[in-house]
Amino acid sequence: MQLNPSEISELIKSRIQGLEASADVRNQGTVISVTDGIVRIHGLSDVMQGEMLEFPGNTFGLALNLERDSVGAVILGEYEHISEGDIVKTTGRILEVPVGPELVGRVVDALGNPIDGKGPVNAKLTDAIEKIAPGVIWRKSVSQPVQTGLKSIDSMVPIGRGQRELIIGDRQCGKTAVAIDTIINQKGKDLICIYVAIGQKASSIMNVVRKLEETGALEYTIVVAASASESAAMQYLAPYAGCTMGEYFRDRGQDALIIYDDLTKQAWAYRQISLLLRRPPGREAYPGDVFYLHSRLLERAARVSEEYVEKFTNGEVKGKSGSLTALPVIETQAGDVTAFVPTNVISITDGQIFLETDLFNAGIRPAINAGVSVSRVGGAAQTKVVKKLSGGIRTDLAQYRELAAFAQFASDLDEATRKQLERGRRVTELLKQPQYQPLQVWELAVSLFSANNGYLDDLDVKDVLPFEKGLREYLKTSHADLIKRIEDTKDLSKDDESALHAAIKDFKKSGAY
């Protein structure tokens, strides 16, 4: 077979014209050491702080230390297969996680990968894990409540949408229980919840997920889990991932609630990473920027204005403000709130709910110390009826705690002091509440109304909770219209007050408790 030179040249020309050569210009370097999930890389010149780096075996890392002749990175996931001399490439991207309604009802890891065995998430959008918080101009003051369903919190330490309220206390004193009850109480309230579990046992996280499923709360909840068995990098990133998922709803005019359980473990993970990266240690061996670690996270929780939402959605959503409410949890050691991380987070947040082991062990649960718990902005968001009725409760409790301390030393007490102590005992009993049984607004209002108007004063302390429960059942069956009015208006009119007085008197006469 004879080949025609002109045909060959034509063929070569057509091949050259049809060639699609894609130039992939990427910076690359070499691994010079791998220890404890920390990699040192030589030869990378153009790297951003927090940029994703690509390692062999489809593994990614995060650039954290940018030095003159090397880059310190932390590996996300397994690192056993990475060795000295491996090639590392830059990606030009900051770490992103999937966001959107597809995540609701799912359990994911810190990178947004599903870990609940229900198949892929199929989220249409991703967003950067680190974002700048909305500016002062775009924020609105807190004015709508987040009902926790817990008597002691809703009456004395109210939380508003867009607030940051710290839950602080020693281990095993009910911090997670308060957070889970708050999530359970959001059923039907149009509030998306995100629960971020950091450094907990996998079995504990599983128990929480199971409880949320049983109560039907998983339908509106995203669980982000970075268990104790996962790397320090994953525990460090989990809160930022959860926050980005929550911001998706905030920026589109919806309301979201995020719980970080707990930020002490995140600070420990960050300390571990920083020490391995040879950053200079400071107080309690934490790095110098541990305050910034938490402030940049918690400042992203905010109530944003209608203009912000309209601008963000390019006019698709109009006249709706969005909010992200944060409930960070901090674990103290032997009640020491003056340690480094607790003082940092107390100064960042808009108030704290302080849980005490002594109260917990005495059977007062939730174990909230009303004297030192405070909500700096939530009062503006409290429902009218609760605001009207709760003032007396806080005063009664504060006076009771003070008098109880003196009463230990005094043998004979005057009548007024004795009455105050008796009322305090009954109010303390009234504020006890079993786990997973959050209350509606009308139920809370009726309980506070009974205490304020002296209907509990002539009861034995042990009869207070049965009386409260019986009264609720009685009102449900005999005064459904009154309940509906209180629940709908979130207020107590003069007529409703009179009707409630009459109903409680009738119930007390019946003695059905």
UniProtKB/Swiss-Prot annotation:
The record describes its quaternary structure and partners as: F-type ATPases have 2 components, CF(1) - the catalytic core - and CF(0) - the membrane proton channel. CF(1) has five subunits: alpha(3), beta(3), gamma(1), delta(1), epsilon(1). CF(0) has three main subunits: a(1), b(2) and c(9-12). The alpha and beta chains form an alternating ring which encloses part of the gamma chain. CF(1) is attached to CF(0) by a central stalk formed by the gamma and epsilon chains, while a peripheral stalk is formed by the delta and b chains.
The EC number on file is: 7.1.2.2
Could you tell me which species this protein originates from?
Burkholderia thailandensis (strain ATCC 700388 / DSM 13276 / CCUG 48851 / CIP 106301 / E264)
Q: What is this protein called?
A: ATP synthase subunit alpha 1
Classification via Pfam families: ATP-synt_ab, ATP-synt_ab_C, ATP-synt_ab_N
Q: Name the catalysed reactions.
A: ATP + H2O + 4 H(+)(in) = ADP + phosphate + 5 H(+)(out)
Sorted alphabetically, the keyword list is: ATP synthesis, ATP-binding, Cell inner membrane, Cell membrane, CF(1), Hydrogen ion transport, Ion transport, Membrane, Nucleotide-binding, Translocase, Transport
Family note:
Belongs to the ATPase alpha/beta chains family.
Binding residues for ATP, per the UniProt record?
169-176
**Localization:** Cell inner membrane
- Listed disulfide bonds for this chain? none
What is this protein's function per UniProt? Answer: Produces ATP from ADP in the presence of a proton gradient across the membrane. The alpha chain is a regulatory subunit.
| Matches recorded under Gene3D superfamilies | 2.40.30.20, ATP synthase alpha/beta chain, C-terminal domain (1.20.150.20), P-loop containing nucleotide triphosphate hydrolases (3.40.50.300)
Q: How the protein sits in the membrane?
A: Peripheral membrane protein
- Listed GO MF terms: ADP binding; ATP binding; proton-transporting ATP synthase activity, rotational mechanism
CC terms in the record's Gene Ontology section: plasma membrane; proton-transporting ATP synthase complex
Which HAMAP family does this entry report, sorted A to Z? ATP_synth_alpha_bact
Name the InterPro entries on file. Answer: ATP_synth_asu-like_sf (IPR023366), ATP_synth_asu_C (IPR000793), ATP_synth_asu_C_sf (IPR038376), ATP_synth_F1_a_nt-bd_dom (IPR033732), ATP_synth_F1_asu (IPR005294), ATPase_a/bsu_AS (IPR020003), ATPase_F1/V1/A1_a/bsu_N (IPR004100), ATPase_F1/V1/A1_a/bsu_N_sf (IPR036121)
Task: Give the positions of the site Required for activity.
Answer: 373
Which top EC class is named for this enzyme in its record?
translocase
